[in-house]
Amino acid sequence: MEKKMAGFCIFFLVLFLAQEYGVEGKVCLNLSDKFKGPCLGTKNCDHHCRDIEHLLSGVCRDDFRCWCNRNC
């Protein structure tokens, strides 16, 4: 009886952990096509990429350009 209960608990533990560690798609970083001017604030770049270009997110990099993350 104890072996069945232990097996039952292990089964649900594995099932729970499998849900927590889902597979994520690959993300690519692309230069924004529509962002104008130097990228000085990541918040503005992120807003632009999400709301205007409908991508995942955006970030300013060392070259003062806005780079957007998208699914590959």
Curated annotation (Swiss-Prot):
Not glycosylated. Has 4 disulfide bonds. It comes from the Eukaryota. Disulfide bonds join C28-C72, C39-C60, C45-C66. Pfam families: Gamma-thionin. PROSITE patterns: GAMMA_THIONIN. Residues 1-25 form the signal peptide. Keywords: Allergen, Antimicrobial, Defensin, Disulfide bond, Fungicide, Signal. InterPro entries: Defensin_plant, Scorpion_toxin-like, Scorpion_toxin-like_sf. One of its GO terms (biological process) is defense response to fungus. May form dimers. Belongs to the DEFL family. PANTHER family: DEFENSIN (PTHR33147:SF56), DEFENSIN-LIKE PROTEIN 1 (PTHR33147). Probably has antifungal activity. This is Defensin 3. It comes from Arachis hypogaea. The lineage of its organism: Eukaryota, Viridiplantae, Streptophyta, Embryophyta, Tracheophyta.
